[in-house]
A protein has these predicted regions:
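Metal-dependent nuclease catalytic cores in nucleic-acid-processing enzymes
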Residues: 176-183, 337-345, 433-437, 482-502
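Domain-level recognition of nuclease-like catalytic cores that cleave nucleotide substrates
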Residues: 491, 495-520
Length: 520
């Protein structure tokens, strides 16, 4: 079988089909949404999750390009293939702009649509210009108009927490969107995508009938790649990757799941893989970090500081009601909506009696990428050496040589300059938490948890489970005694693996960082 051509970086459905590149069939969702009640639809998904390709697929469908859908699910579902005029607005380039720049940008993208339909206008107000365009296209073609808006929130993301700038840009965008309400009779379908959810009142003040399908089960798999799609549409890709990695098909599927799976956008929900990472993985023939490398989480780190959200908090399950994470980011009072809507945490469960959702990191790619990005903020110029230390520690941990592993860690800690920080203990608690969490990059299962003045950690390798208690300014003996007294290791008696108990203590002696340990 000829090797698939993967559409890395290609977001145009027509090009993918004409160039015979691989396409995960999402057309059943297209048919479902276009044949249900409602005219206005909104979908929120993290970046690099296939939103732009979905919008492009809608465009080809509404333009009646039946030949592009040959062999896809919708070919058997759709009987009419009526062609409609489509206005496609991509707002992804409308970032980092002042009010005047944004206004010019909106006029420019309207002009491009005017040129497509040979409609001339010299109006300078974006709302009047768009209103005229919808009316002119409807009259000219004799059909209702389809409006597709990709990344509706792009102009607002940078200023979501700068009230004065946000108000200015939000008013501009509200003005731009206002004709969508007044021309309802001329519109066949309106679809908008974005990353974050801005309050409906602030952006679409008059558009009160948008159907938000972001957390609806019928559309849970509309973006991303579900496990079923992976196993049925990419089966040969799995086999080829397994051959490259010199491991079994089953081992490869498990590795793909641990690295790229784990997303859920409602509950219950199918397992959803990150499409960008999965396609890059198959194209390269190796499992690596892809999605995280496409965006710098500086903004996220700043927000973590603002809301006093620690790295250790990311490792815990967050229990919240729907309104506390599926909420407008510009009015958020915690960091949870930003974490969820950006794809750093996802739904992992739901408790029906309390109506509380469990949110957590989706997979290893996010865990390692996020903690790897946080490490330089705690170790500054020592982060590269820390990564080397973690890599070398992983080899020793897998061998079961814990004395050597902790000697290596202690040698590194001694090189980090002492800083008379008012929260020195808290700083190092988070630093060590991150370093242990990053061992997951080397096939070591790490579950660290924090409490006041200590960290408890379990590490699992192929043949052993290590139960560790890390204290600060106490003693390793005291840490080990706590493991014994509280029977922490009992939970792993039936694992069939050797269970090793380790007490750790971090302290500062003569302004030098020191780690001591005792293995029970």
């Amino acid at each position: 079988m000829a090797r698939k051509l993967y559409p890395i970086g290609i977001q145009t459905f027509e090009r993918i089909r004409k160039e015979d590149k691989f396409y995960v069939d999402k057309t059943e969702y297209i048919y479902r949404m276009t044949h249900t009640d409602g005219t206005y639809f909104f979908l929120s998904r993290p970046r690099r999750f296939g939103k732009s390709l979905l919008v492009s697929t809608f465009q080809s469908y509404f333009e009646g390009k039946k030949e592009l859908f040959e062999g896809l699910a919708i070919e058997k579902l759709e009987k009419e293939w009526t062609a409609y005029p489509v206005l496609h607005f991509d707002l992804s380039k409308g970032k980092h702009m002042e009010k005047e720049q944004l206004n010019r940008y909106l006029l420019d993208i309207i002009e491009k649509q005017e040129a497509r339909f040979d409609c001339k206008s010299n109006k300078i107000d974006v709302n009047i210009r768009l209103d005229d365009l919808i009316n002119a296209v409807c009259r000219k073609t004799g059909r209702q108009v389809v409006v597709l808006i990709d990344e509706y929130d792009a102009p607002l993301l940078d200023v979501a927490h700068e009230k004065e700038k946000l108000d200015d840009l939000r008013n501009t965008m509200r003005n731009f969107y206002s004709p969508l309400k007044g021309n309802e009779s001329m519109l066949r379908f309106v679809f908008m995508t974005g990353i974050t959810k801005f309050s409906q009142l602030s952006i679409f003040s008059e558009l009160n009938n948008i159907k938000n399908v972001s957390m609806k089960l019928p559309y849970a798999g509309i973006c991303g790649i579900t496990k079923e799609e992976l196993l049925t549409q990419m089966s040969d890709d799995i086999d080829e990757l397994a051959e490259n990695l010199e491991q079994s098909r089953e081992e490869t599927i498990e590795e793909l799941k641990s690295h790229y799976d784990g997303y859920h956008f409602c509950w219950p929900s199918p397992d959803v893989f990150n499409p960008y990472s999965l396609l890059n993985c198959f194209a390269d023939g190796e499992i690596d970090s892809y999605w995280f490398g496409t965006g710098t989480p500086t903004y996220l780190i700043n927000m973590m500081r603002k809301y006093d959200f620690l790295p250790a908090d990311l490792g815990e399950t967050i229990e919240v009601g729907k309104k506390d994470f599926d909420a407008p980011t510009e009015t958020m009072t915690t960091i949870v909506p930003l974490l969820y809507q950006s794809g750093y945490v996802t739904i992992k469960g739901y408790d029906k009696p309390t109506k509380l959702y469990q949110l957590a990191l989706p997979n290893q790619e996010i865990r390692v990428g996020l903690y790897g990005s946080l490490l330089p903020h705690y170790l500054t110029d020592k982060s590269a050496k820390a990564n080397t230390t973690i890599a070398k520690m992983s080899v020793l941990v897998k061998k079961g040589d814990m004395d050597a592993a902790f000697c290596l860690l202690n040698d590194f800690l001694e090189t980090v300059p002492y800083c008379d920080n008012t929260n020195y203990e808290g700083h190092w608690q988070q630093t060590l938490y991150i370093m242990f969490a990053l061992l997951t990059n080397y096939s070591i299962l790490v579950e660290p948890h924090t409490a006041k003045g200590r960290i408890d950690i379990t590490m699992e390798t192929a043949d052993a489970i290590y139960v560790m208690e890390l204290k600060f300014n106490k003693s390793a003996e005291e840490a080990l005694a706590q493991i014994e007294a509280r029977h922490y290791a009992d939970a792993f008696k039936m694992s069939g693996k050797k269970v090793v108990k380790i007490g750790l203590n971090f302290s500062v002696k003569d302004e030098v960082n020191c780690l001591e340990w005792k293995i029970g």
